[in-house]
Amino acid sequence: MKIKEAEFVISAVKGEQYPEDNLPEVALVGRSNVGKSSLINKLCNRRHLARTSSTPGKTQTLNFYRINQAAYIVDLPGYGYASVSKTQRASWGPMMEHYLKKRLQLRGVIQLVDIRHPPTKDDIAMREWLNHFKIGAAVIATKADKINRGRYAKHVKQIRQDLAIPKEIPIIVFSAETGHGKEDVLDLLDYFWNGIQPEEEREIL
């Protein structure tokens, strides 16, 4: 799949603000500063489509990006950053839960984790929450350019073990800097949105 057109549509905090064009959606979840915005920008070949920030917890809304006029990527607020106020965190929880449990257009969830480190308690809690509500979620291990390629398999094994991810669920190694794993992620989105399997086997650990 190729992304030929991408546009930011809306930042939403409640269901009435969500797009009403009934297009399929894939949600991105992950710890603050794990690289969700950088992932979106790399996939869309746009530097500033999704705003990146050096300040964790900057994303406080559900941000909808329309892709090829046919589907959405939805960037959810990052979790697990202590400096964000308790009031803000308390408001994010119900907002994210309502979207993930109730949104009929949601076709899949992608959880992003930092490949450099073992999953955090927040990563594990999110995974357990998704499993509890039977929400299928793939995993992308970000910031792959920060470690030696020879260490990918070891780090992915740790992620799979800590998050209790079955072998049939892919973990894609990705770098927004080099583009490593980009085609794998595009294939995954195509599968979630359209049910289309990749034409060729790719490096998914």
From Swiss-Prot:
Cofactor: Mg(2+)
Residues the entry annotates as binding Mg(2+): 37, 59
A GO biological process held by the record: division septum assembly
Pfam families: MMR_HSR1
UniProt GO MF annotations: GTP binding; metal ion binding
Positions of GTP binding: 30-37, 57-61, 75-78, 142-145, 174-176
Keywords from the UniProt entry: Cell cycle, Cell division, GTP-binding, Magnesium, Metal-binding, Nucleotide-binding, Septation
SUPFAM superfamilies referenced in this protein's UniProt entry, alphabetically: P-loop containing nucleoside triphosphate hydrolases
InterPro entries linked: G_ENGB_dom, GTP-bd, GTP-bd_ribosome_bio_YsxC, P-loop_NTPase
Cellular-component GO terms for this entry: cytosol
Domain EngB-type G: 22-195
Domain of life assignment: Bacteria
Functional description taken from the UniProt entry: Necessary for normal cell division and for the maintenance of normal septation.
Cited PANTHER family: ENGB-TYPE G DOMAIN-CONTAINING PROTEIN (PTHR11649:SF13), MSS1/TRME-RELATED GTP-BINDING PROTEIN (PTHR11649)
Family membership: Belongs to the TRAFAC class TrmE-Era-EngA-EngB-Septin-like GTPase superfamily. EngB GTPase family.
Record-given protein name: Probable GTP-binding protein EngB
This protein's encoding gene: engB
